[in-house]
């Protein structure tokens, strides 16, 4: 069953994407369908949605029943989507890089430290699971992953405790891992749960989320029409840095060769984006008050000035 999910920065996403009648849009991270549905309801447009999680197919079918040929779903991760999209181009593309509530709230998915369940964390159910990683990785690798992807200053202490624990028993549940992390750091009431950063780090590593994002951005020019908009909502400083650097590296004002000849200009064909958001937009205090998962969200948007 799909749990209730509140899309983050929904209004800001729609404003940046600016959907129009007759145009086609790509939702790279379908999840519970919040963005796709909002885009479809905003005007008489078309949406193609992607997701590698087979558990969202039922929700996609529900939306397809309501919107017919205006909606299409493809089961794939967005980095591998280019072949399946068959050279189709879009007027706008949106990525929500966060984990949806339906994934966090279902214990069997193994994403959440709030719900005890199998230690899995795989979006697609394939590849290395969190359980395999936690129980087989060397202490240094564990510490490096937790530090790099979780910004966790206690990463070495946590990694040491994990290795000590697994000498006596296998770490096979989210509850066990959460308690190991909490016992390593200490848990002060009212503060963010100490397990937050470690769980985030392992999830990002297991699903190669940063690698997938980088691979997609390298190829996104091939599927975005001229004047098409690219909107990315990220939840981690490393994700935001990748997006920020990509926008910066691919957007630049035309270079004037001579200060006396305004028409003597060159345009670098690799600088194909115009940044819409001068700096990352953050969730409003009101939204964070209603949805705590919005607290770390950042939105960046850019427009293709030519193909």
Curated annotation (Swiss-Prot):
Family annotation (SUPFAM superfamilies): Putative methyltransferase TM0872, insert domain, S-adenosyl-L-methionine-dependent methyltransferases
Residues that bind S-adenosyl-L-methionine: 33-35, 51, 82, 96, 103
Pfam families: Methyltransf_5
Keyword check for Calcium: no
Gene Ontology terms: cellular component: cytoplasm
CDD domains per UniProt: AdoMet_MTases
Keywords recorded for this protein, A-Z: Cytoplasm, Methyltransferase, rRNA processing, S-adenosyl-L-methionine, Transferase
Protein name, as recorded: Ribosomal RNA small subunit methyltransferase H
Cystine pairings recorded for this chain: none
Reactions accelerated catalytically: cytidine(1402) in 16S rRNA + S-adenosyl-L-methionine = N(4)-methylcytidine(1402) in 16S rRNA + S-adenosyl-L-homocysteine + H(+)
Enzyme Commission designation: 2.1.1.199
GO biological process, one term: rRNA base methylation
Localisation: Cytoplasm
A single MF term (Gene Ontology): rRNA (cytosine-N4-)-methyltransferase activity
Function: Specifically methylates the N4 position of cytidine in position 1402 (C1402) of 16S rRNA.
Family: Belongs to the methyltransferase superfamily. RsmH family.
């Amino acid at each position: 069953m799909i749990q209730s999910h509140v899309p983050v920065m929904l209004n800001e996403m729609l404003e940046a994407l600016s959907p129009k009648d007759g145009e086609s849009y790509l939702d790279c991270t379908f999840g519970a369908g919040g963005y796709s549905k909002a885009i479809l309801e905003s005007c008489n447009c078309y949406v193609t949605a992607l997701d590698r999680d087979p558990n969202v197919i039922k929700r996609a079918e529900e939306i397809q029943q309501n919107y017919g040929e205006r909606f299409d779903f493809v089961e794939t991760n967005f980095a591998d989507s280019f072949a399946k999209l068959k050279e189709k181009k879009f007027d706008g593309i949106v990525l929500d890089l966060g984990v949806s509530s339906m994934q966090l709230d279902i214990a069997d998915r193994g994403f959440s430290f709030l719900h005890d369940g199998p230690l899995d964390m795989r979006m697609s159910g394939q590849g290395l699971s969190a359980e395999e990683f936690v129980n087989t990785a060397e202490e240094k690798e564990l510490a490096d992953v937790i530090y790099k992807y979780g910004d966790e200053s206690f990463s070495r202490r946590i990694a040491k405790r994990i290795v000590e624990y697994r000498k006596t028993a296998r770490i096979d549940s989210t509850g066990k891992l959460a308690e190991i992390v909490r016992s390593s750091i200490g848990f002060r009431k009212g503060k963010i749960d100490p397990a937050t950063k470690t769980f985030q780090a392992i999830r990002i590593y297991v699903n190669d989320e940063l690698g997938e994002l980088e691979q997609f951005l390298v190829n996104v020019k091939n599927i975005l029409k001229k004047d098409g908009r690219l909107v990315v909502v990220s939840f981690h400083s490393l994700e935001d840095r990748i997006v920020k650097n990509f926008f910066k590296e691919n957007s630049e004002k035309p270079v004037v060769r001579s200060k006396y000849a305004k028409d003597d200009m060159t345009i670098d064909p690799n600088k194909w984006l115009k940044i819409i958001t001068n700096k990352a937009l953050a969730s409003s205090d009101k939204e964070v008050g209603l949805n705590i998962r919005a607290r770390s969200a950042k939105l960046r948007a850019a427009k293709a000035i030519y193909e």
